[in-house]
Amino acid sequence: MFLRSVSSITKPFRRIESPKQLARRMAVLPDTYADPVRIAVIGGTGLRELPGFTQVASLNIQTPWGTPSSPITILHHTHKDKTVAVAFLSRHGLHHQIAPHEVPARANIAALRSIGVRTIIAFSAVGSLQEEIKPRDFVVPDQVIDRTKGIRPFTFFEGGVVGHVPFGDPFDESVAKIVRACGHSLEGEGVKLHDRGTLICMEGPQFSTRAESKLYRSWGGSVINMSCLPEAKLAREAEIAYQMICMSTDYDCWHESTEDVTVEMVMGNMKANAVNAKHFVTAVLDELADDRNAELVQAKQYAGSVKFGLSTAQANWSPEARERMNWLFPGYFEIDLYIRYLLLIQRDIDLTSWN
């Protein structure tokens, strides 16, 4: 927490795990995991400690796009006498040291795909842009408006290969239905859920001006955060089903009868609602892990979509682009003999040019 109220000084001291202590604890875990992991959670570090889940591995994966924002923690959970594996990644680092515009989203998504992930549940604190979405309410967004500024790398398809994937529906409706059902099942236990909404993703790290906040309301925006993009776009490019769960922590700065958003306000509501958030995410993971959803979490509806979205013929890919694409989609692109022949000719030309 960046800000602290004076009253918090009088509260009992709670020991916080230091970076060295956390690193030491995670170092004890195995650094490999053999089986594919289909489901992942991206969120804050608090969600790594889910009730009923046991940490069994901590993976440090290097990608062509760099290092992910945290090690990927593999969690085991028993559901209906079956052990289910779930991957967890801390979006802003293990100690929330990575700013929204610094999150290595490409490395995060690529690393998750490399261990078999095909469905991502993303969790985020958001500001509410509508009166009916109160602080501590949950929202399952179905649309997003991109207000980032191009500072964040936002595509896998560049530097020698061009691709365009559909993004009309940025979230996966099949996964969203499960999330909504789980949320409504917990409404008697403190969870208040809004089934749909338009998410505004802003650049940050500063909060909105009052004029911006009112503008987003006039556009029909429901909630606002700094985390959804390019995460959701990259997941689509990687053929991964993606659904975000939003937890409202404030009314941004448009509301005339409440205080403007502060970090202290955000963190306070997140802490107060932490139990509900964990129960919600746990319920979703339990449902996704059920045998009847085994096909759904493999996101087969997206399989092969990249092949149809690429505009650059394989023969014309740069060597660097080919290496990146084969890392992200191993065995995915078959190179026929004619293309191999062209590549060999090109290689020979390049070699003779040095003589």
Curated annotation (Swiss-Prot):
Q: Which GO terms describe its biological process?
A: glutamate biosynthetic process; L-methionine salvage from methylthioadenosine; purine ribonucleoside salvage
- The EC number(s) this enzyme carries: 2.4.2.28
In alphabetical order, the GO MF annotations are: mRNA binding; S-methyl-5-thioadenosine phosphorylase activity
Q: Which GO terms describe its cellular component?
A: cytosol; extracellular region; nucleus
Q: Where does phosphate bind?
A: 45, 91-92, 124-125, 227
Q: Which InterPro entries match?
A: MTAP, Nucleoside_phosphorylase_d, Nucleoside_phosphorylase_sf, Purine_phosphorylase-2_CS
Task: Summarize where substrate binds, as residue positions.
Answer: 226, 250-252
Q: Where is this site: Important for substrate specificity?
A: 208, 263
Q: Is the keyword Cytoplasm in the record?
A: yes
Which pathway does it take part in?
A: Amino-acid biosynthesis; L-methionine biosynthesis via salvage pathway; S-methyl-5-thio-alpha-D-ribose 1-phosphate from S-methyl-5'-thioadenosine (phosphorylase route): step 1/1
User: Which compartments does it reside in?
Assistant: Cytoplasm; Nucleus
Please verify whether the record's keywords include Lipid metabolism.
no
Give the superkingdom in one word. Answer: Eukaryota
> Which key words tag this protein in UniProt?
Cytoplasm, Glycosyltransferase, Nucleus, Purine salvage, Transferase
- Catalyzed reactions: S-methyl-5'-thioadenosine + phosphate = 5-(methylsulfanyl)-alpha-D-ribose 1-phosphate + adenine
Family, as annotated: Belongs to the PNP/MTAP phosphorylase family. MTAP subfamily.
Give the protein's function.
Catalyzes the reversible phosphorylation of S-methyl-5'-thioadenosine (MTA) to adenine and 5-methylthioribose-1-phosphate. Involved in the breakdown of MTA, a major by-product of polyamine biosynthesis. Responsible for the first step in the methionine salvage pathway after MTA has been generated from S-adenosylmethionine. Has broad substrate specificity with 6-aminopurine nucleosides as preferred substrates.
Q: How does it assemble?
A: Homotrimer.
Name under which the protein is recorded: S-methyl-5'-thioadenosine phosphorylase
Give the organism's phylogenetic lineage: Eukaryota, Fungi, Dikarya, Ascomycota, Pezizomycotina
